[in-house]
């Protein structure tokens, strides 16, 4: 009986090992693994020393673009993870694929069950829509100049991308009048779960206008009781993303992790010696 149990366990371990991926290079001095999952490109960068709880930050689009936050988190022991659903516009198919990918990361790689979601530009569509359906799996959200309303971007004027969106969502242009897939309209579950959001945006963004996207999210999220912070860059357009000094975003993300150890602030009381005590000590 013991031999049978041993063989079963060995088979399971061997099966898991077979799913592992060979190193394909390095990214900022750490091992990088590129592979496909459900026929889509994926990447994992493994820190030299993983932080407690195996935290990870997950991008659904634009790996290695303006990576100041990713680099800083990698140094602090985060796994940097990418799964390409860039051109799926936060569709139900994208959300379903993302959930399967998440389960693979937490089961096979033993990454934290609470993921930090990172959405740049159109990546915001996936981040918000996936979070709305998987609130228990999210530690926090970092979005940068995010698309939050498809009528703002790509919008009907961008004919090629608009038709691409319609095809992915299996909708007609007329059917979009009743579209229910915009992040700005699906914030209630995220706010109810109290998921913290931080966003970096340019106030002069002409591609994904702040007032039509993240500013709407900010006002509605606050009204729903959700915690949100926005860093607004004056005079900045859609690019460059992120911050030259990523510390405000990194600190925000670190504070939301399940294994984060809050600082204990201590006050050391000090009483100045009296002149008599001072004289006696001489």
Tell me the role of every PLM-derived stretch.
Residues 90-109:
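Alpha/beta-hydrolase active-site loop
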């Amino acid at each position: 009986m013991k031999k049978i149990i041993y063989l079963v366990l060995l088979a399971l371990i061997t099966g898991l090992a077979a799913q592992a991926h060979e190193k394909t290079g390095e990214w900022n001095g750490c091992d990088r693994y590129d592979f496909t999952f459900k026929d889509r490109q994926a990447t994992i960068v493994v820190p030299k020393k993983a932080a407690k709880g195996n935290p990870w930050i997950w991008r659904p689009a634009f790996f290695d673009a303006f990576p100041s936050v990713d680099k800083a988190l990698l140094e602090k022991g985060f796994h940097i993870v990418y799964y390409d659903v860039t051109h799926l516009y936060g569709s139900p198919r994208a959300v379903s694929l993302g959930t399967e990918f998440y389960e693979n990361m937490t089961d096979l790689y033993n990454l934290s069950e609470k993921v930090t979601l990172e959405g740049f530009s159109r990546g915001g569509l996936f981040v918000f829509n996936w979070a709305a359906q998987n609130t228990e799996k999210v530690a926090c959200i970092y979005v940068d100049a995010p698309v939050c309303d498809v009528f703002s971007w790509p919008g009907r004027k961008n004919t090629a991308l608009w038709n691409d969106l319609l095809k992915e969502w299996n909708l007609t242009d007329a059917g979009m009048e009743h579209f229910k897939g915009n992040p700005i309209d699906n914030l209630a579950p995220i706010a109810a779960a109290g998921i913290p959001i931080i966003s970096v945006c340019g106030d002069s963004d002409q591609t994904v206008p702040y007032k039509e996207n993240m500013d709407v999210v900010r006002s509605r999220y606050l009204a729903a009781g959700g915690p949100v912070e926005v860093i607004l860059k004056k005079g900045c357009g859609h690019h460059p993303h992120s911050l030259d000094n990523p510390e405000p975003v990194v600190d925000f993300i670190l504070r939301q992790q399940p294994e984060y150890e809050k600082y204990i602030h201590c006050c050391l009381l000090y009483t100045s010696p009296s002149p008599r005590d001072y004289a006696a000590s001489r």
